[in-house]
Swiss-Prot record:
Component of the eukaryotic translation initiation factor 3 (eIF-3) complex. It comes from Chaetomium globosum (strain ATCC 6205 / CBS 148.51 / DSM 1962 / NBRC 6347 / NRRL 1970). This is Eukaryotic translation initiation factor 3 subunit F. The keyword Cytoplasm applies. The keyword Transmembrane does not apply. Keywords: Cytoplasm, Initiation factor, Protein biosynthesis. Component of the eukaryotic translation initiation factor 3 (eIF-3) complex, which is involved in protein synthesis of a specialized repertoire of mRNAs and, together with other initiation factors, stimulates binding of mRNA and methionyl-tRNAi to the 40S ribosome. The eIF-3 complex specifically targets and initiates translation of a subset of mRNAs involved in cell proliferation. Pfam families: JAB (PF01398), MitMem_reg (PF13012). Residues 311-327, 342-357 have a biased composition (Basic and acidic residues). Belongs to the eIF-3 subunit F family. Residues 309-357 are annotated as: Disordered. It comes from the Eukaryota. Signal peptide: none annotated.
Amino acid sequence: MAVEQEHFVHLARPLAPTSMGFTGSAPLTVHIQPQAVFSVIDHAVRRDTRDTQSTRVIGALVGTRSEDGSEVEVRSTFAIPHTENEDQVEVDVEYQKNMLALTLKASPRETLLGWYTTSHELNSFSALIQNFFASPETGTFPHPAVHLTISTEPGAPIATKAYISAPVAVSPERAAESCLFIEVPHKLLFSDAERAALGTATAAAETEARSAPVISDIETLAQSLESVSDLLERVSGFVGEVLDEERDGSHALGQYLMNALSLAPKVSATQIEADFNNHVQDVLMVSYLANTIRTQIDLAQRLATAPLVGGDKEGGEKGKDGEDGGRGGRGGKRGGGGRGGHRGEPREPREPREPAE
């Protein structure tokens, strides 16, 4: 029977004995890429809302797994058709096999990690599907199958949970439809470029024109510094209120602040300013050298093409002189000597004509 608990203790996963020599028992951590979450949300939005269909959707998780099996990264997903009612659940196994084969053919380095659903409810049907994805024939065996739940209710925040299963206190008769779900840590990954793009899209959503210009790097740096300054003021205000006993403190937040302060370099403000100025000078020097090299390349290209242009002009002038000489030769043959032509023989003098009466 599936068990759901809000507060959990992360224990080493208990696995059944395997014949493949896999004995890893380290805790599991799940990393989720944003495109995988968007794919799940798109599947939930486009689901069939007829009464005969289930209120939740399911699909497969595809990604990479570390060598020791302690970390998995969910990179993509694909939907799996299924029907679910009060008595039974049916999954299109052939569709799942074909889609998995196509996905692995497009991304050979990825593998099947588990499955997802758009409901936080864990029941006997969830155990059946979990055992299907963890089986040796169609699942992730000998590695545990990851079960990811994502809430997609309109107007509500998106909440995610990750589980693995263990055959703990399960009778052999009910092993196929029973398992113990153990919640494991998970984290949503995103890069700095994705965060910057999301910030630009958010800024466009707050304007009436629904558009936002792409600012330069200097303006982006200025905005980042302003944001950091605001965050420091908020943290300072929170710490001051806790010290003045105006609000209750948080042990988790205090530990996080201590860890963040321990990472700060133990240097003076003067040294930081000097290092920053040196860095700026290095950047300016690199920019100057890049512009100089670009100018030299342009100049070398112009010098390399200059003789070709001059040779074409000289050849054109010589061609014109030859054409004039040829024309003169033809004129000399006709008449008594043209430009560049041979002299013709003198003609006999004509008799003067008598004037007409």
